[in-house]
Amino acid sequence: MVAFSAILQTALGLSAANDLTSLFGPYLSPQAEILYGNDTNFYAQLQQRWTDYKAPSYGAGAIKPATAKDVQNVVKIANANSIPFFVTGGGHGISDYHNFDGLSIDMGKFNTVERNAAGDRLTIGGAVKIHQLTKPLAEWGKELPLGSCACVGVVGATLGGGIGSLHGLRGLLVDYLEEVEVVTASGDLIKASETEHKDLFWALRGAGSNYGIVTSATYRLPEVTNKGVYVNADYVYPVSANQSFFEVLEQFDNTLPPRLAITGASFFDRVNNKPVIAVNAVFFGPLEEALPHLQPFESLQPEMKNVSSIPAEQMMDAAFFSFFGMDNGACTPNQHINIYTVALRQIHAPTFQSFYSKLVDFWNANPTYQGRLLIQRYSNEGPMAVPDDATAYAYRDVKTYMNIEGFYADSALDDAVNEFATLGRQEFVETSGFDQLAVYSNYARGDEGPVAWYGERKLPKLSALKRKWDPEQRFSVNNPVPLHWRTEL
């Protein structure tokens, strides 16, 4: 093999990427792949993005590493030649990356799933997706507070906090992370945990994309709840129920039990030309214990309903009567999806009612707009059980995650959607219970800023760790932590 130091002494710039094979090839394993932008179906060979809105460009081509050593070498060579890179795991991020043009590091080959001999620890590759874990976890009698979308990358979700329907009972996914193997900005491969590189481990758990490339992650596995049988309840209401529906959600602010997770979605039924409100409620326990908690939704006199006990591994496909197709539309790649998000400490029913009226008007005025209002209402009891300073994740007290999700094919609608959703987002911020905009960073679109992503109190430490672990800001494409925060200046 050619001496690696020879490559490190060069500084060829982005133009060096015109010949990725000669630049990177000698330092990659046989299983690694190098792709060029002019290759047939170039983008089809990469992990497909969920949305094409403000997507990155890969003018420098792409590399699909197969080993941790491959990742190290790619980072080192890219650094030495001033080639910007963008790392993709599950491909479900929605931030604005349109200003990025460089090299894609596609982690798709890091998809292993391994359980230890004792059966209480799980180690996965950096690109493993949620659907790869649902069946094994059920077979093992274990569970993790995974998200509700099957195609999301597990590690990517974890590094942003890891919310999901189980987190009221189990806490955040990040709280089950015990160790990561990570390639740092210098190209070093290290382990980070509560005992090794503890400061980096703290930062990775909440702002992880800023500090390295996780090649593998190890989680502890709790026993499954109620022998792996959960209650799934679906309800559909007419638009006339919207006021009562939002009042019910508000009443849950201080009464939502940790075993109950509520997801509300309102969309426009173009076939029948009417708005619809749908609710999926999951109760992690037996049916007889669930029914009293579901009574508020029963009292709203749904047009359709289904309440049943089903195995844990079937939960994702059972939700919402499959109104939105397989995986409820969350796994179809390259849709034009434009999302605005807000984290709420409280539900303010009048704000929801006011916005909903405007949303109905927007639907009617824009017949090709298939947007929806998504409300994820989870107890914060599980997240709050872990001290705030234990991880970089900033918003353990959030009770509701709300998205204004714009689904539409014609990008000519972008300006109208952005204007409408920006005003709507600000309306929710004013009654959110927070002093300013707060968001779950994995839902961020990119314009919210560091305080919204990571919280004012976390940023001084995060910035100090950014200077230590990534002073050249190689990992600053996605929701970047600034090198210096204003309280330090």
Swiss-Prot record:
Pfam families on file: BBE, FAD_binding_4
Coiled-coil regions listed: none
EC annotation from Swiss-Prot or TrEMBL: 1.-.-.-
Keyword terms, alphabetized: FAD, Flavoprotein, Glycoprotein, Oxidoreductase, Signal
Residue ranges occupied by any FAD-binding PCMH-type domain in the UniProt entry: 55-224
Known cofactor(s): FAD
InterPro entries the record matches: BBE, FAD-bd_PCMH, FAD-bd_PCMH-like_sf, FAD-bd_PCMH_sub2, FAD-linked_Oxidoreductase, Oxid_FAD_bind_N
Molecular-function GO term, any one: oxidoreductase activity
Signal peptide from the UniProt entry: 1-17
Highest taxon of source: Eukaryota
Stated induction or repression of this protein's expression: Expression is positively regulated by the azaterrilone A cluster-specific transcription factor tazR.
Sugar attachment sites: 38, 242, 306
Pathway(s) where this gene product acts: Secondary metabolite biosynthesis
Annotated family: Belongs to the oxygen-dependent FAD-linked oxidoreductase family.
Alphabetized PANTHER family for the sequence: BINDING OXIDOREDUCTASE, PUTATIVE (AFU_ORTHOLOGUE AFUA_1G17690)-RELATED (PTHR42973), FAD-LINKED OXIDOREDUCTASE AFOF (PTHR42973:SF32)
Record function comment: FAD-linked oxidoreductase; part of the gene cluster that mediates the biosynthesis of azaterrilone A and other azaphilones, a class of fungal metabolites characterized by a highly oxygenated pyrano-quinone bicyclic core and exhibiting a broad range of bioactivities. The first step of the pathway begins with the non-reducing polyketide synthase tazA that assembles one acetyl-CoA starter unit, five malonyl-CoA units, and catalyzes a series of Claisen condensations, methylation, PT-mediated cyclization, and finally releases the first hexaketide precursor through the R-domain.
Name the record gives this protein: FAD-linked oxidoreductase tazG
Organism of derivation: Aspergillus terreus (strain NIH 2624 / FGSC A1156)
